[in-house]
Amino acid sequence: MLNTRLIAMSTSDGAPETKKQRPESSSNGSKDQNGTEAGAEGDSRDKVALITGITGQDGSYLAEFLLKKDYEVHGIIRRASTFNTTRIEHLYADPKAHKGGRMKLHYGDMTDSSSLVKIINMVKPTEIYNLAAQSHVKVSFDLSEYTAEVDAVGTLRILDAIRTCGMEKNVRFYQASTSELYGKVVETPQNEQTPFYPRSPYACAKMYGFWIVINYREAYNMYACNGILFNHESPRRGENFVTRKITRSVAKIYHKQMEYFELGNLDSKRDWGHASDYVEAMWMMLQRESPSDYVIATGETHSVREFVEAAFKHIDREITWKGKGVDEVGVENGTGIVRVRINPKYFRPTEVDLLQGDASKANRELNWTPKVTFVELVSDMMKADIELMRKNPIA
């Protein structure tokens, strides 16, 4: 069995039918979905993976996943006054000293081509997972240029760095795409052939990333895939995302640390899955004989309102909704206390009301299906935040 190691990299901090596929180089040493070596006979090279965004939700779960498969993990973080490594510190043998184990961190940045070239040339990866992004939709309206630099041009920089290093025939590339590409949806559910209609600077930047991956795949015979991932959450989700805001707030209410919290559009519906399920799909995409693009989703939709109700149900409380529009409130049954209020500042300039994915292609070709249900997802997040607020009320 081949030895494996992982080089990981972090920066900021989570389709139409693919055109014709190209045959891949036999030196890639990939595995099919059953774990069988594909084209690796006589290839003694270690399998090396490079992940951008290792300090984020998806990057940390992917690092864990690959470590369990005996990968060695190296990570690159942006230079800053403080380390942003909370999600991966447990992967060190000595978390306080950031030493030991099979993971090391290095410095790099998605906005700096030279650092990408140096890293790729040094580690000579066989797999690259591009997870780094400014991924908050509402923030992208305020930081539109930065979002484009990281999410759009950053993807181009990595692809060009691969070619600069002369490794386009030896590297398998995964691009983290997003269901936000569908935006103002033209059909439900959305699959790989559904037209895009992006509704935010984030989605527009990701759309460029999506198409430049396909362009490089066809122009340079690269093994490059887009994973169109629908919303996926976990206890490691960023605090500024609505799902984590809900579970943190309900946990504070449970501990009597907060009376109510504010939200925006309660009726926005999303296809929510668990991040741990979705990183497995990323890996599966790079183990096939030829590259393609895949929608990864649960196929179920739930509203923000339902997420709130499920979170309160976890602490044995029920919410009744009263009023309309910005005057609507969520009232706790029994006590009559208002627990949820609407604040227009949380509305997006252009809303995306409904996203629901059709992952039948991934199920058919990758043998991938989600394992964690919506209720289990909310429960997992609630348990973690209740414990977090118990230990640190000001977290």
From Swiss-Prot:
Pfam families: GDP_Man_Dehyd. Keywords: Lyase, NADP. Optimum temperature is 30 degrees Celsius. The keyword NADP applies. The active site is at T178, E180, Y202. It catalyses: GDP-alpha-D-mannose = GDP-4-dehydro-alpha-D-rhamnose + H2O. Pathway: Nucleotide-sugar biosynthesis; GDP-L-fucose biosynthesis via de novo pathway; GDP-L-fucose from GDP-alpha-D-mannose: step 1/2. It is an enzyme of class 4 (lyase). NADP(+) binds at residues 53-58, 109-110, 131-135, 146, 206, 232, 237. Its EC number is 4.2.1.47. The keyword Transferase does not apply. Optimum pH is 5-8. GO terms for biological process: 'de novo' GDP-L-fucose biosynthetic process; cell fate commitment; oogenesis; positive regulation of Notch signaling pathway. HAMAP family: GDP_Man_dehydratase (MF_00955). Belongs to the NAD(P)-dependent epimerase/dehydratase family. GDP-mannose 4,6-dehydratase subfamily. Catalyzes the conversion of GDP-D-mannose to GDP-4-dehydro-6-deoxy-D-mannose (also known as GDP-4-keto-6-deoxy-D-mannose or GDP-4-dehydro-alpha-D-rhamnose), an essential step in the synthesis of GDP-fucose from GDP-mannose. This is GDP-mannose 4,6 dehydratase.
